Amino acid sequence: PLHFILNNKYSDYQNNYNSFYRFFKYHDLYEICDRMHYCYQKFGSLESALKSTSGHTLVQRIQNLFIDINGIPKPEGNSACKRICMFLRWMIRQDKTVDFGIWESFSPSELIVPLDTHVHQIAKKCGITQRSTPDIKTAMEITDFMKQIFPGDPCLGDFALFGYGINNK
């Protein structure tokens, strides 16, 4: 993938507006790849670009870095930003089992629990949240709760909630 980005192998998609997945067009893929290319050219890595981007959370930093690109949830939107949260978890947590942990500039304590419908339902059943909308605010509320139990790594709570939901259908 890095070779694909650094060598502009994605350039064929620039003017291709055909859909390839749901609401995403090849041009959207071009935009994401081109922004990543910019990050590697200017900062040397996506991690360094994220360090240099403003935002209260790492999710907001990614949103700000890719602000005008289709497929990246907008900061003011109602998305739970699950894919962004998952990506950050994979890159930052260093458990060497599920997560890669190759970014050392950030702490697992900065992560937000990736929120999907199952985790949301279990969190509601357990009284962790009363919010009915599975959005980033709900993900933050669940994360804040998990920080009371796992202050250094609130995403550990994601495994517990997800596992409970899977095993107790």
Predicted regions and their residues:
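HhH-family (HhH-GPD) DNA N-glycosylase catalytic core used in base-excision repair
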Residues: P1-K169
